[in-house]
Amino acid sequence: MKIWIKAICITSFVIQMSACSSSAQTKNDSRPAQAVQNGIQQHVEGKDIVDIPEAYKRKLKGLETVKGKVLHIKDGDTIDVNVKGQKQTVRLLLLDTPESVSQKIPPQKMGKEASFFLKKQLDGKSVTLVYDQGPKEDKYGRKLAYVFCNGIHINELMAKSGYGIIAYIFKPNTTLLPEMLEAEKEAKEAKAGVWSIKGFVDEKNRHYNRNDAA
């Protein structure tokens, strides 16, 4: 009987020590972590997250920025954002992804994939919108912005991942054009996403061949 009681006590002690060790490890690992996604540094959500990394801050200095929360992903390059209690439709600047919900043409290849990828990055998350030097809206009344979330430039991430191409290039809304073009170049060389479909991207005119439906 004494041996049995002793065994129970030892087991209980081991379990308690394991729980304490696990708790301590969790506490020590609660600092913001960093990871790399498709070559672009991203910051896992945590206390000391910087919305816009220093390298971008220098280039974007003086441009208007606003904070908001993503309400809805409309497609791969358009989102609805709550800004100070008002819903704003935002088009990701310098980016064009294949159509997934257009009423004018059938859904295109990679359109749904682009929307899903963007949703995974932004749905329900806080973002910082950066407006460039030129017009802040397009002809449809959508805001034109660089979108940052947890230290990631989302426009650039979409291009680098092959879910979109660089398009609608109008000065002076071109502050981050070099970074966007470099991201697109890497996706093209890797034959990622839209670049994996032969003849899909019309590079000269910077649009998609619309007859390539999903």
Swiss-Prot record:
Residues 1-24 form the signal peptide. GO terms for molecular function: endonuclease activity; nucleic acid binding. Pfam families: SNase. Keywords: Endonuclease, Hydrolase, Nuclease, Plasmid, Signal. SUPFAM superfamilies: Staphylococcal nuclease. The keyword Nuclease applies. The active site is at residues 91, 99, 142. Residues 64-197 form the TNase-like domain. This is Uncharacterized protein pXO1-141/BXA0211/GBAA_pXO1_0211. It comes from Bacillus anthracis.
